[in-house]
Amino acid sequence: MLLYIVIIVACIIFILVPNEYWAIHLFFIIMIFMVYMYEKLDVHQKYQFWNYTMSGLSGHNVQVLCKCY
């Protein structure tokens, strides 16, 4: 469901935003890919996915507060 919402928002943005703002288009393409990969994971893999993503973005070892048992 989340994937469909992101795709719909991306389509609206592609229509409204001119092509010279290519970074906005690229951002939504990356978001579609991330949401697609996230929805394919199970509960424990989702925890590790966000832990790895946040530590990669920040450059530090980030512990997510959600402990999925």
Swiss-Prot record:
Any one GO cellular component localisation term in the record: host cell membrane
Intervals, Extracellular compartment: 37-69
Annotated transmembrane regions: 16-36
This protein's record includes keyword Transmembrane: yes
Localization terms from the record: Host membrane
Source organism per UniProt: African swine fever virus (isolate Tick/South Africa/Pretoriuskop Pr4/1996)
Sites where a glycan is attached: 51
Membrane topology: Single-pass membrane protein
Keyword set, alphabetical order: Glycoprotein, Host membrane, Membrane, Transmembrane, Transmembrane helix
Positions in the Cytoplasmic compartment: 1-15
Family: Belongs to the asfivirus X69R family.
Listed name of the protein: Uncharacterized membrane protein X69R
